[in-house]
Amino acid sequence: MADQADLLESPQFEEETSMQKFKRRLKEEPLIPLGCAATCYALYRAYRSGKAKDSVEMNRMFRARIYAQFFTLLAVVAGGMYYKTERKQRREFERKVEERKAQEKRDAWLRELEAREKEDKGWRERHAAVSEAANNPVGVSAVVAGKKEEEEKGVDGNVNQAPQEEGGVKRGTGILDAVKALVRGKKD
């Protein structure tokens, strides 16, 4: 377990972009691109010799292409054996980084899911309270009576209320007012 933490905190390995990786691999194994370039040059020269109808030069260039490909393959195998342990460590490091990123992504997803669930639960509770208030006329009248008492005490400072008629009787007492009272009652 300690070696995994050391592997993640090791200054030897760090996350790199594709260009950084290309440059690093070019510095580690410069013979592979050299062999590829030699192969391409031999093919180009063989093509030019074929166009010039020089079959001797063309055959010579095709042999040079085979030698260049052998050299490239040899460089790949030798580099693979030489950098075997480092590549294994780097793969392990990259695997750990990917696991960490996947875990962070999963945790963020779970947090979002919990927030949505909490929001949905709150909506269901509000919906249940509204349904109960709408279905229970006794509860509505009790809520309306409680609201009238609050208005008389001057506790209710809501500007967006229906205007009151003369004589203190409020116009528009109904389900909407009951719902507002329920919501306000839960906030207090």
Swiss-Prot record:
Annotated Gene Ontology cellular component terms:
mitochondrial membrane
Could you name the domain of life of the organism this protein comes from?
A: Eukaryota
Principal location: mitochondrion
Topology relative to the lipid bilayer, per the entry, is:
Multi-pass membrane protein
Q: Which Pfam families match?
A: HIG_1_N (PF04588)
- Location in the cell: Mitochondrion membrane
Tell me the disulfide pairings in this chain: none
Q: Which residues cross the membrane?
A: 30-46, 66-83
Coiled coil, from the record: 83-119
Q: Where is the HIG1 domain?
A: 3-94
Q: Supply the alphabetized keyword list.
A: Coiled coil, Membrane, Mitochondrion, Transmembrane, Transmembrane helix
List this protein's GO terms for biological process.
mitochondrial respirasome assembly
Give the region (Disordered) as residue ranges: 147-171
Q: How does it assemble?
A: Associates with the respiratory chain complex III/complex IV supercomplex.
Q: What does this protein do?
A: Cytochrome c oxidase subunit which plays a role in assembly of respiratory supercomplexes.
Q: Which family does it belong to?
A: Belongs to the RCF1 family.
> What protein name does the entry list?
Respiratory supercomplex factor 1, mitochondrial
The organism that produces this protein has a lineage beginning with: Eukaryota, Fungi, Dikarya, Ascomycota, Pezizomycotina
